[in-house]
């Protein structure tokens, strides 16, 4: 795998540090809250599968992918408005279940009420190619250089949420090594897409507060310690 995708990035702009550490995790309809509170950093959830649809055609690696114009333009408007107010934006990219696009969920995973979000699918060829194309689309659209999004800029990217708990990244019971290996493949794909577009964007994963102390039900193979994830 590539270790330095940033060298080919067309956007080599320096990372812009937020003016203050005061921030807010927002919904798309919370523009006024952010302005009223005077925050200079916001986190926005991006529902991965909702981006597929119609209205925007995107060519990637010899294939055409179709994106939901109304969803994309809603994100364009909100993110560009924040940037216009000198507010830095972090995207938390989450893989929600979509019956129309089962290829986005890790192969072999069944829909369950115990999961909020699912593991990204880089296991099958179709899943990998579609997932990679969506990552590339997001990286390009929110590079700060795309006039189609009114130059909307995402500076920080987080793949999934609290990855040591499968409620946010469900793939079914798995030992720690298998789980981390699966997430790692998705993360490398994500990292490459972002950094090969904007060299100095920052790409993260997140953990919850269970660092070393085990969950009560740690042996169920869907919960792991944060330390275990990092060490693996």
Predicted features along the sequence, with ranges:
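N-terminal substrate-binding region of glycoside hydrolase catalytic domains
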Residues: 1-152, 156-158, 163-175
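Noncatalytic carbohydrate-binding groove/subsite architecture in carbohydrate-active enzymes
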Residues: 17, 131-134, 139-140, 146, ...
